[in-house]
Curated annotation (Swiss-Prot):
Belongs to the EGR C2H2-type zinc-finger protein family. Residues 275-302 are annotated as: Disordered. Transcriptional regulator. Recognizes and binds to the DNA sequence 5'-GCGGGGGCG-3' (GSG). Activates the transcription of target genes whose products are required for mitogenesis and differentiation. A zinc finger (C2H2-type) spans 372-396, 402-424, 430-452. Keywords: DNA-binding, Metal-binding, Nucleus, Repeat, Transcription, Transcription regulation, Zinc, Zinc-finger. This is Early growth response protein 4. It comes from Mus musculus.
Length: 478
């Protein structure tokens, strides 16, 4: 910096003694005649013109001022002193990036700190001048009285009409730094570099900044907190839209389409045509059992042509072909056949009573209709249960899968085989409640019970004719 003394007052210059002379002469020496006009002209004229003319004439003035011994001196007794220097204190003496940013600020280039530097530095890593006297004010600055301590670098608020600034907004001062300890710039010559250099920025400021080529004026930057955090709300909405999609991704949407597995229908002809699946329906289980009341009922797997709507599905079967059991040389037992359908056959619901009638406690949603019709064209019978249809079909086909192990007699129904075996063993599990007579079949017991009912009715008629009912007596009381 160039510091010049104020030479406007001539009285102040004449009052200072001469510096650097060995002996001061009490009275002014007489100058040569060639310098007389200059000496006579100085008291009311220019001192610099007189000094230069005196030194250029013979050098006596200069020699007399700097050599020891008595010598003539100028009448003013003044010396001109000045200094020209540049006081530059580097912000980071050992940081190449700081030097690069300093030179960029001087040359008018906008610094662009990389992501590594922005991530490694903390918000408190602000550009403070290095050195022991960095925090002291500049004693040689002429504008010390007007502005003692300018604002710190991060608090230099941009104003409209100022030079253009690129990429980032000025960051607010950290809360940990006290306002009284803010460091001034190193020197007034580095104000341009200080305005260009910026400290590390917050992540949302880095995200909200544009590309390096888009530079705008400082007047376009926003300094309000609402404007600073507007980009944060946008980023949060983007993250929520990614983490919580409104619909399934592409592969999942292709695998699970809406309405693909709601309902399925089974065509009547899916189980095969003809009598290929009929032996499997007519084949009884391995053990003995009956469909009547004696030994339980044989409930075969119902045909899979039963649809939810209760439509006929067995009407397409053709029973004109002979079965395996009816062929000559057959053992009477149908050969097992693989199921034609991949879906398991659903079992029909067992009724409390026969004939398709439910009890009073039954809450069946479907109407009580006989959905299982005989597929034979000449037969018009229909049944409410599939096992009843299976027993009926054996009448048309003549299939007798149940054989007695004692006499090798074949039967079309399991209950018939059960009662036949009791004839060989002599078992009579059913006993009359009135007389105690025992029977081998339940239907025989029912027929016998009707005999007792008729006898009771005749006895009551006799007592009524005798007048016992008028006295309040009955046949049971007698």
């Amino acid at each position: 910096m160039l510091h010049l003394s104020d030479f406007s007052g001539s009285d102040a210059l004449l009052s200072k003694p001469t510096e650097g002379c060995a002996h001061a002469s009490p009275e002014l020496p007489r100058l040569p005649a060639r310098d007389a006009p200059s000496a006579a002209a100085y008291p009311g004229g220019d001192f610099l013109s007189w000094a230069l003319s005196s030194c250029g004439a013979g050098g006596d003035l200069t020699d007399s001022c700097f050599l020891e011994g008595p010598a003539p001196t100028p009448p003013s007794g003044l010396s001109y002193s000045g200094s020209f220097f540049i006081q530059a204190v580097p912000e980071h003496p050992h940081d190449p990036e700081a030097l690069f940013n300093l030179m960029s600020g001087i040359l008018g280039l906008a610094p662009f700190p990389g992501p590594e530097a922005a991530a490694s530095r903390s918000p408190l890593d602000v550009p403070f001048p290095a050195g022991p006297d960095a925090l002291l004010p500049d004693l040689y600055s002429p504008d010390l009285s007007s502005a003692a301590f300018p604002e710190a670098f991060w608090e230099a608020a941009p104003s409209a009409g100022a030079p253009s600034q690129c990429l980032f907004e000025p960051q607010l001062s950290p809360p940990d730094v006290k306002p009284g300890l803010r460091a001034p710039p190193a020197s007034p010559a580095l104000d341009a570099a200080a305005s260009a250099f910026k400290g590390p920025y917050a992540p949302w400021e880095l995200l909200s900044a544009g590309v390096p080529g888009n530079c705008g004026s400082q007047g376009s930057f926003q300094t309000t907190p609402e404007a600073r955090f507007s980009a944060v709300g946008t980023k949060v909405e983007d993250l929520l839209s990614i983490s919580c999609p409104a619909e399934l991704p592409g592969p999942a949407a292709r695998l699970y389409q809406a309405g693909a597995y709601d309902t399925f229908s089974l065509a009547p002809g899916d189980l095969g045509e003809g009598t290929e699946g009929l032996p499997a329906l007519l084949t009884p289980p391995g053990g003995e059992g009956g469909s009547g009341g004696e030994g339980g009922e044989f409930l075969a797997a119902p045909p899979a042509q039963l649809s939810p709507l209760g439509l006929r599905g067995a009407a397409t079967a053709d029973f004109s072909k002979p079965l395996v059991a009816d062929l000559p040389g057959g053992s009477g037992v149908a050969a097992p056949s693989s199921p034609a359908a991949s879906f398991p056959a659903a079992k029909a619901r067992r009724k409390g009573r026969r004939g398709g009638k439910c009890s009073a406690r039954c809450f069946c949603p479907r109407p009580h209709v006989k959905a299982f019709a005989c597929p034979v064209e000449s037969c018009v019978r229909s049944f409410a249960r599939s096992d009843e249809l299976n027993r009926h079909l054996r009448i048309h086909t003549g299939h007798k899968p149940f054989q007695c192990r004692i006499c090798l007699r074949n039967f079309s129904r399991s209950d018939h085989l059960t009662t036949h075996v009791r004839t060989h063993t002599g078992e009579k599990p059913f006993a009359c409640d009135v007389c105690g007579r025992r029977f081998a079949r339940s239907d025989e017991k029912k027929r016998h019970s009707k005999v007792h009912l008729k006898q009771k009715a005749r006895a009551e008629e006799r007592l009524k004719g005798l007048g016992f009912y008028s006295l309040g007596l009955s046949f049971a009381a007698l």
